């Protein structure tokens, strides 16, 4: 549980102090919103499904970049 709190604090710190991390977080939120919009449609076309997969991959890539920055910050804090 303590690790989760430390991660939350680290994310909050990066959101306040790191413009690149903040940009990634905003991109991730926007991509999540776009995916949810497609998923909420009553009828999803093949083009919608392709777009949804593209957005999900992009969202995952941004999340990976954020996690990489968090990991770098963890090491900087320890070292």
What are these regions (language model features)?
Residues 1-79:
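Extended, charge-rich alpha-helical interface modules
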């Amino acid at each position: 549980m303590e690790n989760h709190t430390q991660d939350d604090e680290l994310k909050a710190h990066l959101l306040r102090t790191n413009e690149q991390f903040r940009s990634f977080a905003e991109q991730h939120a926007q991509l999540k919103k776009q995916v949810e919009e497609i998923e909420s449609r009553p009828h999803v076309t093949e083009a919608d499904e392709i777009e949804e997969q593209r957005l999900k991959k992009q969202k995952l890539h941004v999340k990976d970049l954020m996690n990489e920055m968090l990991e770098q910050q963890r090491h900087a804090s320890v070292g």
